[in-house]
């Protein structure tokens, strides 16, 4: 028996016929047999809460539940009903779940022809014909028994969906039997996620722009599916311009075409290794050195030039004229899109039906931030720049996570979790514990072994490879570690790498290795095999691994064969050696260190598996030598790191790959955990062949690194890194350098490259730069975190609130008994271009550290500087600069 939804008056209780997990965040999932109290009806959907847990509430489809009715004198039917239900289960082999209804109400017609034609795997019988057949059959069954004629005619309505009742009636048993025998209908359209997000009463997003209007969004979604029709099995939705017609079919997520395109074995033929030589020896030759070194050097040379900063202010206005459609902050969001109730009907009544009903907005096209002083004073421009660099909260990050996952289903949001969870360890044999090799390496006299290797490695060309290895490395090398070190120095310092130009046969052992032994140059593949043969001659277990090496300026989340390295069993512990990257002639060292090296890179000698997995991805999981093994996708999405990342004991603290896919006015943000004696600097490098554009990018402050807090558990510091791409730039890279604290005294990077993060951007963007942080030798005892303003540009005629947090560099606050000099008070101030000093006021004058604040009316264009008393207590030191335009 069925009832019309329009005749129901909430609240009432329903019981779940099937279990349902929900589709969106606002849905209510339940188990079979759960009882819910319905408080609202929205079309074919109910809104209610679970009676067993009233904290859980949300939307759920009406045809997954049955209405609970209190009936009297139904004990006779209750005794007969279970047997018939059991019979119906015996007649059918499987339970057919009813289709999930559309979230649209019946008053809103939706186009279905385009949707059904775009579904490749749609059933032959449409949904409408199924529903008509079911209605016809139900009518026949109602006519068979006159008992139910009255109730059927009372509740029958063709325009509204029907709800099954929990009454023990014979026609209902027949309907249940037939519903189980019917084929599974096609999945309904997915809910309108954009509309659901608008009704979600959470913290607002960071900033919004005119692109948030429905017309621009629908056009953007149409272009997105059109460009990615191969991923979505050719699905291209209709180009819609109204919110009511916006719908997405779950049929577009068919796996057929996607699996055909992506199905490939990790053990492919070695013919795929056509670019092996490019990453082994010659790929970094064209880079010479990381561009972040030269960019930072040029910025430091131009830091004192006033003309450069005036030109920057002019370029700032020009770039804003070309990209005026950036996000304007939360205030526009509140004006353009009013708050709506979660009820669909109430929101449709309260919301304006046309754009004319909204309050009149300022013309966004006239938002030229610095063309004239009058426009620069505009409060929208000021708020936009102040709020853009605001630190992201979990509510800001979550929509970006969901958007990235929608665009790439294979994306791993937090790949570092598989390494830092404490479960994965380096593989060892027997009952030994991992890490004993590191202890032996610390006690190894490396300088003595390296000098002895240079003296003993005499290649006269008279002995075979095995006899030469046993003669050279057996007498004076007492342990396995010393023998491996000797072979490593021989291969990395006494051979020059040559490019094979793709001629190496990686499926077989290189020929004439004994002749190569007495030469001074070889290809990367030959050098790897030479190390293996020498180690095997000394009885050391050593095997070659051919896999994928992550490289700069490449797509590193797609596996391909391009590199080879060695896995070695030493003292019952598996370690890795890469003689190609450790070789002194490899151009990668000049790229990372900004100079050539004369000694072999020690980081690639007996590298731990948990460190090797960042850059070297083997095709088979057992070759990782990590217990338990790490998923290959997680390893591919780990950031590209270099030896100084592990030398300086850096660690990913809050890192997400989804945040690197920028849209409109978004910024990138990540956090690193660093020791107290290490400093970190970052810069953004834009690849371009245009010299004028490259010079302009060098002078821009596109990254900001600050020490945010001290981690209480470990005593280590948290470095917060933010980055942004300039206007009209789609791709760039974030370069992170690290080194000993206090050694870098200018903006020019002197520390080696530690980490690279690729950044992409789409949509509109306004020019934005971060405040210039200036390192100084005289400020080493305290850490200064600029809360606001973090933007580089200030606008004349506006009042700004300056806020700086001062904390001890070692994280220790001494008591008064330990001496007053331990907690020296270091006041701060803001200096105007004319030389006037505005002192900042401390929030808690009795506490040695804390927050310093001050509100200043900006009236002078030029460079504004942040000052702090030096550690010696004599004189001011500049630690930050802003540019007023």
From Swiss-Prot:
It is found in: Cytoplasm; Bud neck. InterPro entries: CAP/Cytokinesis_protein (IPR052557), Ig_CYK3_C (IPR056409), Papain-like_cys_pep_sf (IPR038765), SH3-like_dom_sf (IPR036028), SH3_domain (IPR001452), Transglutaminase-like (IPR002931). GO terms for biological process: mitotic cytokinetic process; mitotic division septum assembly; secondary cell septum biogenesis. Its main location: cytoplasm. One of its GO terms (cellular component) is HICS complex. Residues 97-209, 300-325, 815-835 are annotated as: Disordered. It comes from the Eukaryota. Residues 9-70 form the SH3 domain. The modification Phosphoserine is found at residues 209, 292, 313, 354. The modification Phosphothreonine is found at residue 391. GO terms for molecular function: enzyme regulator activity. Pfam families: Ig_CYK3_C. Keywords: Cell cycle, Cell division, Cytoplasm, Phosphoprotein, SH3 domain. Involved in cytokinesis by recruiting INN1 to the bud neck. Cooperates with INN1 to stimulate the synthesis of the primary septum (PS) by CHS2. Present with 377 molecules/cell in log phase SD medium. Interacts with INN1. Belongs to the CYK3 family. This is Cytokinesis protein 3.
């Amino acid at each position: 028996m069925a009832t019309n939804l329009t005749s129901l008056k909430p609240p009432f209780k329903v019981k779940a016929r099937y279990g349902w997990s929900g589709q969106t965040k606002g849905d209510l999932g339940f188990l079979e047999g759960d009882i819910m109290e319905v408080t609202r009806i929205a079309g074919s959907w109910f809104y209610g809460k679970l009676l067993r847990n009233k904290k859980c509430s949300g939307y759920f489809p009406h045809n997954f539940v049955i209405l609970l009715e209190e009936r009297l004198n139904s004990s006779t039917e209750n005794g007969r009903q279970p047997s018939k239900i059991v019979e119906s289960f015996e007649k059918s082999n499987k339970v057919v779940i009813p289709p999930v209804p559309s979230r649209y109400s019946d008053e809103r017609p939706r186009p279905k022809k385009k949707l059904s034609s775009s579904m490749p795997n749609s059933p032959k019988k449409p949904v409408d014909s199924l529903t008509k057949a079911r209605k016809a059959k139900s009518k026949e069954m109602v006519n068979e028994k006159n008992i139910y004629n009255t109730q059927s005619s009372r509740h029958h309505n063709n325009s509204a969906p029907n709800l099954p009742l929990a009454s023990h009636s014979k026609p209902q048993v027949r309907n249940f039997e037939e519903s189980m025998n019917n084929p599974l209908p096609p999945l309904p359209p997915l809910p309108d996620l954009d509309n659901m997000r608008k009704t979600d009463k959470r913290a607002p997003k960071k900033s919004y722009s005119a692109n948030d209007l429905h017309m621009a969004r629908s056009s953007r979604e149409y272009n997105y599916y059109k460009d990615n029709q191969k991923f979505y099995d050719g699905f291209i939705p209709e180009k819609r311009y109204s919110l009511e017609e916006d719908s997405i079919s779950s049929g577009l997520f068919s796996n057929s075409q996607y699996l055909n395109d992506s199905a490939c074995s990790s053990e492919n033929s070695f013919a795929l290794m056509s670019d092996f030589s490019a990453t082994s020896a010659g790929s970094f030759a064209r880079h010479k050195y990381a561009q972040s070194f030269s960019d930072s050097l040029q910025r430091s040379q131009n830091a004192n030039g006033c003309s450069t900063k005036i030109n920057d202010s002019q370029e700032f206005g020009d770039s804003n004229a070309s990209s005026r459609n950036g996000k304007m902050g939360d205030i526009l969001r509140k004006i353009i899109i009013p708050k709506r109730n979660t009820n669909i009907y109430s929101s449709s009544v309260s919301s304006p039906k046309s754009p004319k009903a909204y309050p009149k907005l300022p013309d966004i096209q006239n938002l030229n931030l610095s063309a004239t002083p009058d426009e620069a004073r505009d409060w929208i421009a000021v708020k936009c720049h102040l709020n853009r660099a605001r630190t992201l909260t979990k509510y800001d990050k979550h929509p970006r996570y969901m958007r990235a996952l929608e665009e790439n289903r294979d994306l791993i949001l937090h790949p570092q979790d598989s390494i830092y969870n404490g479960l994965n360890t380096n593989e060892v044999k027997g009952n030994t514990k991992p890490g004993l090799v590191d202890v032996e390496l610390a006690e190894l006299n490396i300088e003595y072994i390296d000098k002895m290797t240079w003296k003993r490695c005499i290649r006269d060309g008279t002995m075979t490879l095995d006899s030469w290895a046993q003669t050279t490395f057996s007498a004076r090398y007492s342990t396995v570690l010393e023998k491996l070190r000797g072979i490593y120095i021989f291969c990395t310092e006494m051979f020059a790498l040559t490019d094979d130009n793709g001629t190496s046969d990686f499926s077989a052992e290189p020929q004439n290795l004994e002749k190569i032994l007495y030469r001074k140059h070889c290809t990367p593949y030959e050098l790897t095999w030479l190390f293996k043969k020498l180690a095997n001659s000394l009885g050391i277990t050593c095997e070659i691994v051919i896999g994928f090496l992550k490289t700069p300026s490449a797509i590193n989340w797609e596996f391909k064969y391009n590199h080879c390295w060695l896995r070695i069993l030493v003292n019952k512990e598996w370690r890795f050696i890469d003689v190609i990257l450790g070789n002194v002639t490899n151009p990668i060292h000049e790229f990372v260190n900004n100079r050539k090296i004369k000694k072999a890179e020690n980081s690639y000698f007996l590298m731990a598996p948990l460190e090797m997995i960042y850059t070297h991805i083997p095709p088979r999981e057992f070759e990782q030598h990590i217990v338990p093994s790490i998923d290959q996708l997680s390893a591919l999405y780990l950031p590209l790191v270099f030896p100084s990342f592990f030398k300086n004991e850096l660690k990913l603290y809050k890192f997400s790959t989804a945040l690197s896919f920028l849209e409109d006015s978004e910024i990138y943000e990540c956090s690193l955990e660093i020791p107290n004696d290490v400093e970190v600097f970052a810069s953004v490098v834009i690849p371009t062949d245009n010299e004028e554009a490259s010079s302009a990018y060098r002078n821009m402050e596109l990254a900001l690194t600050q020490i945010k807090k001290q981690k209480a558990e470990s005593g280590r510091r948290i470095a917060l890194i933010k980055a942004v791409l300039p206007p009209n730039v789609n791709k760039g890279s974030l370069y992170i350098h690290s080194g000993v604290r206090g050694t870098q005294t200018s903006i020019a990077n002197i520390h080696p490259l530690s980490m690279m993060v690729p950044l992409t951007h789409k949509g509109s963007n306004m020019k934005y730069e971060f405040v210039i942080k200036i390192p100084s030798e005289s400020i080493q005892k305290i850490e200064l975190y600029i809360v606001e303003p973090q933007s580089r540009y200030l606008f004349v005629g506006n009042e700004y609130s300056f806020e700086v947090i001062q904390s001890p560099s070692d994280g220790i606050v001494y008591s008064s008994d330990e001496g007053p000099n331990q907690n020296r008070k270091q006041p701060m101030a803001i200096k105007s271009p004319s030389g006037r000093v505005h002192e900042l006021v401390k929030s808690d004058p009795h506490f040695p550290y804390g927050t310093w604040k001050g509100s200043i009316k900006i009236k002078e264009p030029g460079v504004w500087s942040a000052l702090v008393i030096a550690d010696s207590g004599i004189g001011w030191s500049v630690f930050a600069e802003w540019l007023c335009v």
